[in-house]
Amino acid sequence: AELKKDLTTFPTVIGDWVIDHQQNSESLVGLPDADESFVRSYRASDGRRVALSVAYTRTQRQGKELVGMGTAPLHEKADPTVLRVEEGSVPANRTIIDRGHRSIPVTFWYHINGTGYADRNLAKLATIKQAFVRGRTDGALVMVSTEPRKDDSEESWKRQEAFAAAVFPLLQEYLP
């Protein structure tokens, strides 16, 4: 399925976060076969930064799966969490991705047919169901990462997840 809106038009202001054009952003986990993707940095008024990464796949096939070998490293150290969004809650994951000597905190979920999935098996099932019911296999991997931090406090995770929760309803306007 096609995107509802072009990802390049995604908001540059989200709550008290503003796009940061100075930051060089690269995706931590690549979906090399993604049909549409973007990585953007946002900065809060207190200087905190987050990177938002969205990788959208129109169709999946063997070797080009949304949930597969490419995303397996995300799940190795993942712990479930819940994003509090306006209508309720969205399941997500917390994980740490090691890049060189840096440990990067990441909140991520799969966005399939307007629903967020943290569990990779449920995400795969949702894709299969969507293929049978709607004849499509599209979906997205959404990641919110921050700079490495010394403290792994609950408060730091909550702030990161608050940004992720603000992103979720906006994604509904873009992703099918």
For the regions a protein language model found, what residue spans apply to each?
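Surface-exposed amphipathic alpha-helical segments
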Residues: 139-176
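Alpha-helical transmembrane signal-anchor/signal-peptide segments
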Residues: 1-14
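Short glycine/proline-enriched loop/turn "hinge" motifs that connect secondary-structure elements
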Residues: 131-137
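Short, solvent-exposed recognition patches
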Residues: 18-21, 25-130
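Envelope-exposed proteins and targeting segments
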Residues: 13, 38, 48, 138-140
